[in-house]
Amino acid sequence: FVYSTKIGNNTSLRFVNFGFNYHKSKNFNRLFASGGNLTGGLSQTWQMANMMGVYMDEVGVPEADTGNELDEIYNSNNPYDVNRYDAPYLGVMGIRTNLLGVNSENKLIGWDGLGNKYTSREEGGIHQYDFNVAFNFQDRFYLGLTLGAYDVNYNRSSYYTEDVAYGADEGFYELNNWFETRGSGIDLKLGTVVRPFEDSPFRIGFAIHTPTWYNLSDYHSADLYSDVTFNYQDGTSEQLKTEEFTPDYVK
């Protein structure tokens, strides 16, 4: 959209033009899916175990107290309190859904993966709005200014599930993650064209584009559901179904 206003033929300022433009500068829409058998017992639960192992090393938990630390996190009213634990949330969720344990050597252990499935959906984009004003001085000096405003919206949801086993024990778990980025941005573009010689078509110009300054906020949360059965040597078994939600994180 352009609106042109003629000021006069004999005035220094001949024209003032106003413009507006909109376009979607970035499209985030995407779908992804995968799945299959897991070779070599590969499982995300071992990633959870490694995360918590690194955390315990950093905070100085003695190896002999690994089991006690797991019990404390498992029974905590708020294990996501960064002032108390500051532990990786995926590892905490693994503890509280019976996906992590401790072996006879006080080492954190996970499960052996049998098969998995993963789906991801991304939506959103960056919407750009340009507001323009341009001046024509004596048909020889042209000045333009554009203010760019950006609206950012990005959403991603993912689902991951694994069938797992460890010795005679077996089960599965499902992990849902939600992530959102919202915000806005702004930039400026300034340009000029000069015709230095009145009787010549020769022109020279230059332009300045500022970086785009963004103010963004991230929101993320997760949900982990597990259904595992422990088969004991005396012939009895115990089925545990657990669901764990994280609080909404804002950054």
Locations of regions flagged by a protein language model:
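Outer-membrane beta-barrel porins/channels
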Residues: S4-K251
